[in-house]
C-alpha cells in the first residue's frame, strides 16, 4: 500500500518537568539545532498553560506538527472532591506535559494531527518511545496501524485536497468584506502577507485558506502559518522572498519591512504598507472580482468550490489578455511583457503595474 510516510520523517518528544524545565527527551532519527530551537519557540510548553493542543507551522522546507498533552497524576471528583490517583508510566512521573512533534515535507494538518494525537496517546499510556517507532514502521510498511482504544490511523483516508478546503473561502470573504480585494490582489501578485491574531487557533484557521484565492497554483508551501519574532525565524522568513506568515506577537504590526499587506484578525482590517501602496491601486478588474466575491455571500447556493472556480476563470481570462499584450524582443526573439510596453498603452492608473506583477507571478516572462 502506497504511503507518503518516510522513515526519514522525524518524531521528537519535548517534555516539561515539575520544575518547569523543558527539554528534548527523545528524537528519531534526528533534527538540526536550528529546528530544535524553532520547535521550542513554537510549542506551548514554555507557557504556563497549554494554549492550543495542536498546531502546524513551517521552517525552511519542513512542516512542523506539534501535539501537546498534559500528564495528570490525579483526578478530582467534581461531586465529592475526592482524589483518585492515575496510573502513570514511571518515565513520565516527573513530567507535567509533553509535546510530540512530527516533522514532515508536506502540508496536511488533518492527517498529521491525527497521527500525532494517536502517537501521543500511545506515549502517555506507555512512556515507551519504541512504541512510537512501531507506529511509524507500520504506517510505512502497511499504510496503517491500529492501537485499539488509543486509535486507528489509515494513511489513505487523508486526501490533501480536503486539507486545502478545510476553511471556507466564503467565511474569509465574510470576515473582511470589501477589504478582501486587497488579500486577493496580494495573493495574485505574490506579495508578502503578514497575518496577525492574538489567538493562534484563529490565526491557523484563516491563514491556511489564503491560497484558495489563487487555487490554480495549488501552492500551500507559500504559507508560514506561525512564526515567532526570533532572529532565526525572521531570517528564514525573509529568505523565502514571498510568503503568507502568521504571528501572535503584536510587535509585528510595526515591521513594515516584512510585509506588503498586514491582515489584522483582531480588528478585521487589512492595511497596505507605505512602501507598497503604488502596487495596490485598484482598477475596474479589481472591482469586478470584488463584486463577484461579495455577491457570493448573498447566495447560499454558491458553494466554496463555485467561488474558487469563479476566481480561476477570472484569472484565466486575465492571463489570456496578458498573452495578447506580449511583445517580441528583436534581439533575443523572446516574447515578454515589460512595464515600459504596458505604460505605452496608456492603461488606467495603476493597471500597468498590476498587469506586470501578474505576468511575473504567473511566469509569463520566463
From Swiss-Prot:
UniProt cross-references to Gene3D superfamilies, sorted A to Z: 3.40.50.11500
InterPro entries in the record: DENN_C (IPR043153), FAM45 (IPR042431), Tripartite_DENN (IPR037516)
Statement: the UniProt record of this protein carries the keyword Hydrolase: no
Major subcellular site: other
Presence of the UniProt keyword Hydrolase in the record: no
Chain ranges of the dDENN domain: 311-366
Phenotype when the gene is knocked out: No visible phenotype.
Key words, A-Z: Endosome, Guanine-nucleotide releasing factor
Highest taxon, organism lineage: Eukaryota
GO biological process: protein transport; regulation of early endosome to late endosome transport
Pfam families the UniProt entry points to: SPA
Domain uDENN: 1-147
UniProt subcellular location: Late endosome
Residue ranges of every copy of the cDENN domain listed in the record: 169-309
Molecular function terms, GO-annotated: guanyl-nucleotide exchange factor activity; small GTPase binding
Main function: Guanine nucleotide exchange factor (GEF) which may be involved in the regulation of homeostasis of late endocytic pathway, including endosomal positioning, maturation and secretion.
Family: Belongs to the DENND10 family.
Name by which UniProt lists this protein: DENN domain-containing protein 10
UniProt organism field: Dictyostelium discoideum
Gene: dennd10
